[in-house]
Amino acid sequence: MFRRAIINKDTQVCMSLAARPSNFGTRFHNYLYEALDLNYLYKAFSPTDLTQAISGVRGLGIRGCAISMPFKEACIPLVDELDASAQAIHSVNTIVNTNGHLKAYNTDYIAIARLLANYKVSPDLVFALRGSGGMAKAVACALKDAGFTRGYIVAIDEASGKQLAELYGYEWRPDTDGIEADLLINATPIGMAGGNDADKLSYSEQEVDKASVIFDVVALPPVTPLIRYARERGKTVITGSEVFAIQAVEQFVLYTGIRPDDALFQKAAAWSRL
């Protein structure tokens, strides 16, 4: 699918900021712009200076900006207003620019909560959540709201790990030694394409073998080493590409005010994964 419309002075520009951008968001949003005949354009960037990049969003009239690892917390002081979701989680993945006023949201939470419900993941399961950054905060909040009462925040950084665990009434651990969990969640860059840990599992094979549900929020590649191994073992898997698609359509709604029907959403998500 190729963009037929000619870019002109009235074209609304949306963008993303990530340390390691993928083509998923670019293909997803531009597919929907084309399908709905909207005068919008989406482009991914990898900023060398976050403060200047956010200033550019404001100064150039960029309509919307997606925020990915590792900028989800660092951009908070750079915006004018936090939506209730971003304020509660203290993590941002979306910025909407309305006449120079930058308001930040967190649509990661929506995606995670929806997927836990769609896959009927029982809140009775004991979980292990690896990570304590912006995405981990959204996951922990969604788990708490879904009724999960027993779980571990596994984070090397003791300060942020303990803070996140205490906020939601969970237990912090520096590693997974001695943990037996039915639900394993990775909210770190382990397994992400282009990184030093791209080929690594975020949990050991033995830990995956003992679990029943595996949830990896890493979207690139669509099948991470963790997801591949879990599928081979017949586990229920929830992928980062599913998270990405749901949070992206919620961003699309914030940017354009239009909600695509489910059939169009599925087509855009499928196109994005090619």
Task: Report residues per predicted region.
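Short, conserved loop/helix-junction motifs that constitute active-site signature segments
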Residues: 5-8, 121-123, 145-147, 202-211
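Phosphate/diphosphate ligand-binding glycine-rich loop within oxidoreductases
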Residues: 2-119
